[in-house]
Amino acid sequence: MITNAISKIIKYDFKNTQLLNEALTHPSVLSKDNNNFNYERLEFLGDAVLNLVISEMLFNIFPYDTEGNLAKKKTALVCGTKLVEIAQSINLGIFIIMSDGERSCGGANNSNNLENALEALIGAIYLDGGLKAAKDFIFLFWKNSATHMKVPPQDAKTILQEWAQSKGFPAPSYHIINKSGPDHNPCFTVEVRINSHETLHATGHNKKLAEQKAASLMLAKINYKIK
């Protein structure tokens, strides 16, 4: 059974297996009884729980870090790349319930699907077992990475903002100029503008990713070398 297989991997047994089923159900699967029976609502909750637990984890692991350094570390631990890495480490994609069409298009390996399902899984664990259960799960898969973070990682948006400040420019501005694709797999196009430099735009499966890509393009445009 799927429930037993995934429970062994995540080291958690669900009391309410319906929550697990909901967390693993892709929006492409239409329910006759409830069109909201998919992972989107649990994803919303799981995102908040993950951010809370990671923030507390870093606060305790690094008692002498500044707020800025803690924020940079948290960003690296909750970013899409990290979520996909963890989702792949537990083979989450094979457990996601999706339409035949979505699966045939590579849905089981789609980064956006993996991110969303992992956050939904955290939300489901939180509702089923409380904050302690959610903490145990997050600590199991995130603590090693958090503990070994030495230098605060630099993300493109932060670097671009610091560069702008060093030049006396206003902070870079980001605007969504287009959104396409279905609700369960959207594609955002974001434009970045900074002082008198020409605007550049980039696309991504979520707003944050598109902003990071746009910032990276702007850094390349101004010939900034990321250390």
Curated annotation (Swiss-Prot):
PROSITE patterns according to UniProt: DS_RBD, RNASE_3_1, RNASE_3_2
Keywords, ordered alphabetically: Cytoplasm, Endonuclease, Hydrolase, Magnesium, Metal-binding, mRNA processing, Nuclease, RNA-binding, rRNA processing, rRNA-binding, tRNA processing
Which Pfam families does this chain map to? dsrm, Ribonucleas_3_3
- Which SMART domains does the record associate with it? DSRM, RIBOc
Tell whether rRNA-binding is among the UniProt keywords: yes
Question: Where on this chain does Mg(2+) bind?
Answer: E43, N116, E119
Name the chemical reaction catalysed here: Endonucleolytic cleavage to 5'-phosphomonoester
A cellular component term (GO) from this record?
cytoplasm
Q: What is its EC number?
A: 3.1.26.3
Compartment list: Cytoplasm
Residues annotated as signal peptide? none
GO MF term (any one): ribonuclease III activity
Describe the location of the DRBM domain by residue ranges.
Answer: 155-224
Per the record, the major location class is cytoplasm
Recorded hits in PANTHER family, A to Z, give: RIBONUCLEASE 3, RIBONUCLEASE III
Q: Report what the protein is called.
A: Ribonuclease 3
Provide the taxonomic classification: Bacteria, Pseudomonadati, Pseudomonadota, Alphaproteobacteria, Rickettsiales
